[in-house]
Amino acid sequence: GAAWRVKDLTLTPSPYLKGYLDEFLQDTRLSPLTETNRGCPFECTFCVDGVGSRQKIFKSSHDRVKAELIYIASKTRSKYLQLADVNFGMFPEDIEFSKLFSKIKNEYDFPHHIQVCAGKNNQERIIKCGEILDGSLRFGASIQSMDDEVLKNIKRSNISYEKLIEVSKRVSNTEASTYSEVI
């Protein structure tokens, strides 16, 4: 049967808020990792997030993310934050999370850089998140192949080359950095 999943992410105790990761937060070679949501609506064949049991998106609460970020910001020696979200900018809540990250940065001087995989289907929201975060955001866009037959067989569609360049240019105007990768 389908794998069981936690539907309410706030029911899982935060390892940050429990203090379990304090020693790692002091190591400048490491970056804290958190998430605002879990799951992916797409079905890419070779992606663990594309399997049927993970297709439903479960979101964390604003209060939980805020508490974790304040805790991390007060303990970490890193300037980087990794977000495990696989489609950041896809959901309306991502605007609110971007505002939260910006507020935390202004109050705690953290995070200077946020690494996240951006959603490809809502370019305006992605750009808005970049504007709110004023240079802190590092957006990644991934492709698995440039061959249409391969993409069909693996149930994936890429953002068009033209759109990728357009979004990269527009995001660059927000002072966010971008990167792409072949996965």
Where are these regions (language model features)?
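Radical SAM [4Fe-4S] cluster-binding motif and immediate context
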Residues: 13-174
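Glycine-rich beta-alpha loop elements in corrinoid/cobalamin-binding modules
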Residues: 1-8
